[in-house]
């Protein structure tokens, strides 16, 4: 039997960096769930919170600026702290082929520092993917506004950005779920987003993908959406796939996506037929021209469960094409607009003259000075 030595340096190196409180919590959740084949980094301006992180590498941002006391929910301080620690961030990310940046948007550190970290990751040549949450509505308008600005800034710096709207989690969890549990669920969804992609590259399975496959779907693709489906029982594969494509986390249908990455994870009893069934359902829901890649991973802990994760990318390309088509259509229709607006303006100004004979109306349309003409007739009738 032939044996080959595998050089571990040749495998794609994946690093997950949790930024701020929400990001660090998500990293802890990934470590607890035994996420394999990735290196974990936790960064924060809050030294006390950083101490609770389970990541192998911990980095305090902006030691001089914040003195380890946090960013005070101010994204500008988070940004400056990351700029101060830029060299240390680069050192921590060095050697990575792929970097996941995970954060809860709306606070100070995650919102302000994540775009700076993404910029550094891109500079070292890594495929950079952001997986972040948008805050719950009950967290307040200010946090929501800060999150929107942070998401816009981060989108400019990453290859692909997956935004998980926390409000959508309320459609998944029971209405009696305690608030702390709801926040834990948000961390868990961040974990599933990262694991759904990284497992395809780093974990042995029935159908493996290489790093180049994932890069094709995710490089320079802008906005992305994620759907997760979990099912057990006789028709578990089909049900999990249907749940994934109709997941509340997907804010739109898969139709507009240019690329779809799919992960089917099950226990040792996962069959090839089940993988085929799930892939067929997701493929049928996608655009005919979509670039779809899928893989399957074995996780002994799942036993009877199947988890289907769908990442849909390239919505920005489709939106740009639609906008261009609409713009072309508007330009063609433009010459007809002024006449209609003048007619409406005349009708609004002189509503009592609508009963004039049709011939008069047609004559008046040939003149440009409609209001004056109507005013003259009004004087004569008096």
From Swiss-Prot:
Chain intervals for the UniProt region annotation (Disordered): 322-382
Function (record text): Essential cell division protein that forms a contractile ring structure (Z ring) at the future cell division site. The regulation of the ring assembly controls the timing and the location of cell division. One of the functions of the FtsZ ring is to recruit other cell division proteins to the septum to produce a new cell wall between the dividing cells. Binds GTP and shows GTPase activity.
GO function terms (MF aspect): GTP binding; GTPase activity
Stored PROSITE patterns: FTSZ_1, FTSZ_2
Stretch forming the signal peptide: none
Protein name: Cell division protein FtsZ
One CC-aspect GO term: cytoplasm
GO biological processes: division septum assembly; FtsZ-dependent cytokinesis; protein polymerization
Pfam families (UniProt xref): FtsZ_C, Tubulin
Lineage: Bacteria, Bacillati, Bacillota, Bacilli, Bacillales
Biased composition regions of type Basic and acidic residues, renumbered to the chain: 340-352
Residues engaged in binding GTP: 21-25, 108-110, 139, 143, 187
């Amino acid at each position: 039997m032939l044996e080959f030595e595998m050089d571990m340096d040749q495998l794609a190196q994946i690093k997950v960096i949790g930024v701020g409180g929400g990001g660090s919590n998500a990293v802890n959740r990934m470590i607890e769930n035994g996420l394999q084949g990735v290196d974990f980094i936790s960064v924060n301006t809050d030294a006390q919170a950083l101490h609770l992180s389970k990541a192998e590498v911990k980095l305090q941002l902006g030691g001089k600026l914040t003195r380890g006391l946090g960013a005070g929910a101010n994204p500008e301080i988070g940004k400056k702290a990351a700029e101060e620690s830029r060299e240390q961030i680069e050192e921590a990310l060095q050697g990575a082929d792929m970097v996941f940046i995970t954060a809860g948007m709306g606070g100070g550190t995650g919102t302000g520092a994540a775009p700076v970290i993404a910029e550094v990751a891109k500079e070292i040549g890594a495929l950079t993917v952001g997986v972040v949450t948008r805050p719950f509505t009950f967290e307040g308008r200010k946090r929501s506004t800060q999150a929107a600005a942070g998401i816009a800034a981060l989108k400019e710096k990453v290859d692909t950005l997956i935004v998980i709207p926390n409000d959508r989690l309320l459609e998944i969890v029971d209405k009696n779920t305690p608030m702390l549990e709801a926040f834990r669920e948000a961390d868990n969804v961040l974990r599933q987003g990262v694991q759904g992609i990284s497992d395809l590259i780093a974990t042995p399975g029935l159908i493996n993908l290489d790093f180049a496959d994932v890069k094709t779907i995710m490089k320079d693709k802008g906005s992305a959406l994620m759907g997760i489906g979990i099912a057990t029982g006789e028709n578990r594969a089909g049900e999990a796939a249907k749940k994934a494509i109709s997941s509340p986390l997907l804010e739109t249908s898969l139709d507009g996506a240019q690329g779809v990455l799919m992960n089917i994870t099950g226990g040792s009893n996962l069959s090839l037929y089940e993988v085929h069934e799930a892939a067929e359902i997701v493929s049928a829901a996608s655009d005919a021209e979509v670039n779809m890649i899928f893989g399957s991973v074995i996780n002994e802990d799942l036993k009877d469960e199947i988890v289907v994760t769908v990442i849909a990318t390239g919505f920005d390309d489709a939106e740009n094409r639609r906008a261009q088509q609409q713009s072309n259509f508007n330009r063609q229709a433009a010459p007809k607009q002024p006449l209609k607006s003048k007619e409406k303006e005349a009708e609004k100004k002189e509503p009592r003259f609508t009963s004039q004979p049709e011939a008069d109306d047609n004559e008046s349309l040939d003149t440009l000075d409609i209001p004056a003409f109507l005013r003259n007739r009004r004087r004569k009738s008096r």
